[in-house]
């Protein structure tokens, strides 16, 4: 899960901390923000469920007796120590040196035991499937479900990471020369630079909080990663009774540099399409056949040629006489080469030209392998009753990742939401991109599944944009990101009303209490009960327990994001978790204060172990 930034939106906080959710609509009638039509609040069962859940929930998230009832006194002490250490900036900044020194001084076995009883035990679900299953079952006893994430990554130096990135650069080129009469040269060049490997940003881990990073280590390793995802699916299936998710990163299943080229081709195609449609937004930009041919004629193209007819047939993907961007390629078609996916009409010659050129046969095969591995994981998960959550990554890789994910949703989300795409609210274009995807889902009739996060790559994204010379993709400040998050949630809730509760779902992945309260308010306002599986919450394992367990025990749908893997190989993850907690905890000490409050309460009342989930 992308890092969830913690902060206080004080007007919202005052609105909610009274312990009662207030809504602007009537208690009996809830209205859609875009239609004004009443939501269906007629189900007595769902109304009763909502009322009972809200009556059980302390919206201040300060009822420590309930929030930490799953923790033993030892676990409370461990959490306090770990979070306190994460708040000491000197220790956090030197955490890798400290860990390496401990490993050398203590020896492998004692070092491993020490970590399992401290940082590893607090932030990681376990090493083996059996250990993970025990944690999953314990969480479920307290109303919390699980998302499994195998968090092993190569422990390599920054120079080694850069070398892997530069060495793996694709020989393929995206040549948008055919677009020059339509798209201005500056736009084409800026796009090319943005989606090119730059050595100073070769280590994709730099300036990243929380998110795991994969570097390409050959096709055999990608096959191993696919099998690891399948093992995660098995673990979820055996322990969660069809309730769980597995987090998947597309960069684990193939060469990231191919995703970079694919992303450039997608964005250059968007540039061309926007120019053809007069600069319309992605969701608005649609042309009838008459408008299409008229526009080409205005550009001096002979419209009665076979090439133009073929081009129109390719971009009119559903044969409805309308051209739109979403049908311009078929990523998952195993019989179509990557070099053939993006055919662009050369305005000067009137002929079709491939946008991606000079792909070697080896690269073509690597891309097909990546697609096959992705589909293997998806189909295996569906067979086991487990859902897939595709993680978002950097903006220069995300167009390709999103396109692959949306194509998977088209293929596998016909009956229920098996595949979820991730949207990062700290990006300026998130609402527009999500709107375009929802429009396609509505038109084609498949389930739209979204995970909404704040984002994990802010520092790197801003530095890269400034150095290379393109617009900063990140919102200006925390408040703008919060506004984007809330706008996306509101828009999804309206889409639920428009399409029905079985066709749209969203996971609110956030540690921000105000964001969670906003989502809860939407559920009440739009009459969405927890059992309808439309809106759920998620937090990282070892963080924000006062929110997760309060929600779970009140009856809301909530998940913990569970990293797991061998101690030694999860150290890079633990290092980032320490860094993230350091930046968060120096601003907000609420969780630590609540843990200390609960420990003192137990000591004063003579309680020496966690209560069972069934006790009152």
From Swiss-Prot:
Localization per Swiss-Prot or TrEMBL: Mitochondrion matrix
Q: Which reaction does it catalyse?
A: L-proline + a quinone = (S)-1-pyrroline-5-carboxylate + a quinol + H(+)
**What GO terms describe the biological role, i.e. biological process, of this protein?**
proline catabolic process to glutamate
Induction of its expression: Up-regulated by infection with P.aeruginosa.
Tell me which family the UniProt entry assigns to this protein.
Belongs to the proline oxidase family.
One GO cellular component, as annotated: mitochondrial matrix
**EC annotation from Swiss-Prot or TrEMBL:** 1.5.5.2
The name on file for this protein is: Proline dehydrogenase 1, mitochondrial
Q: Which gene name belongs to this protein?
A: prdh-1
Judging by the UniProt lineage, the source's domain of life is Eukaryota
Q: What happens when the gene is disrupted?
A: RNAi-mediated knockdown reduces the survival incidence, results in increased bacterial load and reduces ROS production following infection by P.aeruginosa. RNAi-mediated knockdown inhibits the nuclear accumulation of the transcription factor skn-1 and reduces the expression of skn-1 transcriptional targets including gst-4 following infection by P.aeruginosa. RNAi-mediated knockdown suppresses the pro-survival effects of the addition of exogenous proline following infection by P.aeruginosa.
Q: Name one Pfam family in it.
A: Pro_dh
The GO terms this record gives for MF are: FAD binding; proline dehydrogenase activity
- Cofactor(s) required for function per UniProt: FAD
Q: In which pathway does it act?
A: Amino-acid degradation; L-proline degradation into L-glutamate; L-glutamate from L-proline: step 1/2
